[in-house]
Amino acid sequence: MAEGGASKGGGEEPGKLPEPAEEESQVLRGTGHCKWFNVRMGFGFISMINREGSPLDIPVDVFVHQSKLFMEGFRSLKEGEPVEFTFKKSSKGLESIRVTGPGGSPCLGSERRPKGKTLQKRKPKGDRCYNCGGLDHHAKECSLPPQPKKCHYCQSIMHMVANCPHKNVAQPPASSQGRQEAESQPCTSTLPREVGGGHGCTSPPFPQEARAEISERSGRSPQEASSTKSSIAPEEQSKKGPSVQKRKKT
C-alpha cells in the first residue's frame, strides 16, 4: 500500500516538472504593425507579419494591452505603427508580453486621448464663488462666513438683480422702445377722417377747393353734395338691411 502510494506520488511529480519548460518555450518573438488600438479601453491588436525571423504568408492577430507597451506617459499605439514584440499562446489566443518600437526603442503612441477624461476637467472660465464673488474657489470652499444676498449685476446689497436700477437703465425693454417711438411719431395722414377711414388722427380742415373739385367730378355742387350727405346719414343710422338699399335706389 505504501509502495503503491509512493509510486503514485512519484508519477505526479515527473508530470509537473515539464510545465515551466513548456511555458518558457511558448515565449516567441515577432514583428508587425498595429492593426487597431482603442485608447479609451486600453487594448488592441497587432498584425504580426514575421514570426521568429520567418515571414508569414497571412498576417496573424496578436492581442496587446497598454500595460505591455514600452513607452513613457500615456501608453497607446497608433494605427499602422511598426512594433517588435514577444508573445505567448494562451487559452484566449496569442497575447503579447512586451511591445517596443523597431530595435527596442519606445513606442510612438497615438495622438488621440480618451474623451471622457477631458470632459471631466472643470473649465475655470466663468466659475466664481457665489458667497464672496471670488474667482479662485467655489462657495463650498469659501473661508468667509455666509454673506448677505446681493445683486449679481452691480454687487449691491440694497436690492436684487430683478429690481436693479442700473440694469433697467442700461437695457430698456424692447416693448417700451417701440411704444415710445410710436408715440413720438406724429400722424402723417393728410386725408380727413371721413375719407381716410378713421385712423384716430386729427386731420386738418378739408379745404373748400378740394370739396369743389370732388363735387365737380361727381357732377354735383358742393352744397348739393353736403345736403345729400346730411339727409342720407340719419336715415342710414335709423334703418338697416334692405330698407337702406331701397332708400338709396329711390
From Swiss-Prot:
Listed InterPro entries: CSD, CSP_DNA-bd, Lin-28_RNA-binding, Lin-28A-like_Znf-CCHC_2, NA-bd_OB-fold, Znf_CCHC, Znf_CCHC_sf
Renumbered residue ranges of the record's region Disordered: 1-26, 98-126, 169-250
GO biological process: miRNA catabolic process; negative regulation of pre-miRNA processing; negative regulation of primary miRNA processing; positive regulation of miRNA catabolic process; pre-miRNA processing; RNA 3'-end processing; RNA destabilization
One Gene Ontology molecular-function label: sequence-specific double-stranded DNA binding
Segments carrying motif Bipartite nuclear localization signal: 112-125
Zn finger spans (CCHC-type): 127-144, 149-166
UniProt domain CSD: residue ranges: 29-102
Biased composition (Basic residues): 114-125
Positions with biased composition (Basic and acidic residues): 210-219
Keywords noted in UniProt: Cytoplasm, Metal-binding, Nucleus, Phosphoprotein, Repeat, RNA-binding, RNA-mediated gene silencing, Zinc, Zinc-finger
Residues the entry annotates as binding Zn(2+) 1: 129, 132, 137, 142
Induction summary: Might be negatively regulated by the microRNA let-7b.
Tissue specificity field: Expressed at high levels in the placenta and, at mucher lower, in testis and fetal liver. Isoform 1 is only detected in placenta and in moderately and poorly differentiated hepatocellular carcinoma cells (at protein level). Isoform 2 is detected in fetal liver, non-tumor liver tissues, as well as well-differentiated tumor tissues (at protein level). Tends to be up-regulated in triple-negative (ER-,PR-,HER2-) breast tumors, as well as in liver, ovarian, and thyroid carcinomas.
Residues binding Zn(2+) 2, per UniProt: 151, 154, 159, 164
Pfam families xrefs: CSD, Lin-28A-like_zf-CCHC_2, zf-CCHC
Motif Nucleolar localization signal per record, residues: 239-250
Subcellular location: Nucleus; Nucleus, Nucleolus; Cytoplasm
One cellular component (GO) term of this entry: cytosol
List of residues that carry Phosphoserine: 54, 96, 105, 110, 203
Gene3D superfamilies from the UniProt entry: Nucleic acid-binding proteins (2.40.50.140), Zinc finger, CCHC-type (4.10.60.10)
UniProt feature, compositional bias: Polar residues: 173-191, 220-231
PROSITE patterns: CSD_2, ZF_CCHC
Domain commentary: The tandem zinc fingers, also referred as zinc knuckle domain (ZKD), mediate specific binding to the GGAG/GGUG motif while the CSD shows only limited pyrimidine-rich sequence specificity. Both domains bind single-stranded nucleic acids.
Family to which this protein belongs: Belongs to the lin-28 family.
Record's function text: Suppressor of microRNA (miRNA) biogenesis, including that of let-7 and possibly of miR107, miR-143 and miR-200c. Binds primary let-7 transcripts (pri-let-7), including pri-let-7g and pri-let-7a-1, and sequester them in the nucleolus, away from the microprocessor complex, hence preventing their processing into mature miRNA. Does not act on pri-miR21. The repression of let-7 expression is required for normal development and contributes to maintain the pluripotent state of embryonic stem cells by preventing let-7-mediated differentiation.
Protein name as annotated: Protein lin-28 homolog B
Gene designation per UniProt: LIN28B
